[in-house]
């Protein structure tokens, strides 16, 4: 009187394509190339309401927690296009899982794992990591992404603040399936910018053999960026002795030599005036008028130097106001 045992294989798989476990990497690479060719066909790009994009040769999944704006969430867009499958919070994923709680970096050593079981990401807000129940999103192969720079409009230029599609693309590039990254990034106008922005780093990571070498490549890159720190310069500091130029305005190339010539000329003129004053002082060295003239001749260079300094400062202030 027990329940009738259902024959194996009679259940329908809901939206899942079961791949043979013994598929070789060469066969997988051929499927990747076919998927790329199908994705670049003009008919697929123009007909958004057609049969949908070509199926990817590996499974893509995500745990969606509802932290992000649905209109900006790249993971939800991929799910609407049928490229990514949404998982329940407590559902297990057997492939590679990109998670902040991972202990190893993604590396080319994960190539076979990705080809056989796919990749999953966690769609959560970077501002709510402490409130995200990572322990409920179960997986056997948790991985971290190395240092990369985001190209999405929300976090452009920020290191490690990648969106879902950028995380998928980074993992595919590192394990050696860059065509899959191109297929996903083509769905976004800014997608190509992610590959251009991180080309050097992605090539370094893809040339590694394991997670340890990926870590060394990351540390080497970060060390090289710290070796050349940017100099902190205040362009409004008039006492710094530096000359600054407004790049939005043309600057005459003869301006600096003219100023130098004028300065030299003024110095020569001051020296001539000092000699003339000395000659005038010689006829009456002991008179009261001679003493006053002598003291005035000593103070004149200092007064002229102070006048030049105040004039230069005033020019700098006027130039800053004009700019």
UniProtKB/Swiss-Prot annotation:
Region (Disordered), start-end ranges: 1-25, 247-323
Pfam families, per the entry: Fer4_RLI, Ribo_biogen_C
Phosphoserine: residues carrying this PTM: 24
GO molecular function terms noted in the UniProt entry: 18S rRNA aminocarboxypropyltransferase activity; S-adenosyl-L-methionine binding
Enzyme Commission number(s): 2.5.1.157
Superkingdom of origin organism: Eukaryota
Main location: cytoplasm
Compositionally biased spans, kind Acidic residues: 259-282
GO terms, biological process: enzyme-directed rRNA pseudouridine synthesis
GO cellular component, one term: cytoplasm
UniProt enzyme class: transferase
Sorted UniProt keywords: Cytoplasm, Phosphoprotein, Ribosome biogenesis, rRNA processing, S-adenosyl-L-methionine, Transferase
rRNA processing keyword on record: yes
Entry keyword Secreted: no
InterPro entries associated with the record: RNaseL-inhib-like_metal-bd_dom (IPR007209), Tsr3-like (IPR022968), Tsr3_C (IPR007177)
Residues annotated as binding S-adenosyl-L-methionine: 74, 122, 145
Catalytic activity: an N(1)-methylpseudouridine in rRNA + S-adenosyl-L-methionine = N(1)-methyl-N(3)-[(3S)-3-amino-3-carboxypropyl]pseudouridine in rRNA + S-methyl-5'-thioadenosine + H(+); N(1)-methylpseudouridine(1248) in human 18S rRNA + S-adenosyl-L-methionine = N(1)-methyl-N(3)-[(3S)-3-amino-3-carboxypropyl]pseudouridine(1248) in human 18S rRNA + S-methyl-5'-thioadenosine + H(+)
Location(s), subcellular: Cytoplasm
Role according to the record: Aminocarboxypropyltransferase that catalyzes the aminocarboxypropyl transfer on pseudouridine at position 1248 (Psi1248) in 18S rRNA. It constitutes the last step in biosynthesis of the hypermodified N1-methyl-N3-(3-amino-3-carboxypropyl) pseudouridine (m1acp3-Psi) conserved in eukaryotic 18S rRNA.
Family: Belongs to the TDD superfamily. TSR3 family.
Name of protein: 18S rRNA aminocarboxypropyltransferase
Provenance organism: Mus musculus (Mouse)
